[in-house]
């Protein structure tokens, strides 16, 4: 931003979404909606609506679960919620669309990156395994190794099968 001479035109704030005050022309939220939790998604979208200026746009990057799996998923703790990301929750597109609409926002576009993210996870897993000796020397044991190898493989398979997706979507305040 500074190198491009935009520091007088752009204000970046890294903060908890619940602490936002004022109106913004643009809001970006990158892979944090998963940490909001099922019970707080309505408030998350309400906060975006409240803080987005008229005609303002928000860009969200989120990991989502396929609509056909959502009902089972939302009522049962999965491996990631139990061992990796307690309290995490993947929304589905249908619920996102409902929250967006209920808050007077409009989705402009959805872009899927599931295949790209599957490839990224494969690279991360391979790099993790290549660097295992360095990691082990920091005090991590074989249980940790198996857990993370499984986690990365589990996620890669989820993206490849389209059971989960990495989406970017933009929405606008009507």
Residue spans for each PLM region:
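Conserved SAM-binding strand-loop segment of SAM-dependent methyltransferases
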Residues: 4-17
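A short His-aromatic
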Residues: 35-36
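A short acidic, Gly/Pro-enriched loop at the edge of an enzyme's catalytic core
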Residues: 15-30
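ATP-dependent adenylate-handling active sites, centered on carboxylate activation for C-N bond formation
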Residues: 6, 22-25, 171
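Conserved hydrophobic residues forming the short capping helix/wall of the S-adenosyl-L-methionine
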Residues: 1
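Substrate-binding/catalytic lobe of Class I Rossmann-like enzymes that use SAM or dcSAM, i.e.
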Residues: 64-174
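A short glycine-rich, Lys/Arg-flanked "PGG" loop and its adjoining helix->strand segment in the class I
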Residues: 42-57
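Alpha/beta-hydrolase-fold catalytic nucleophile elbow
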Residues: 61
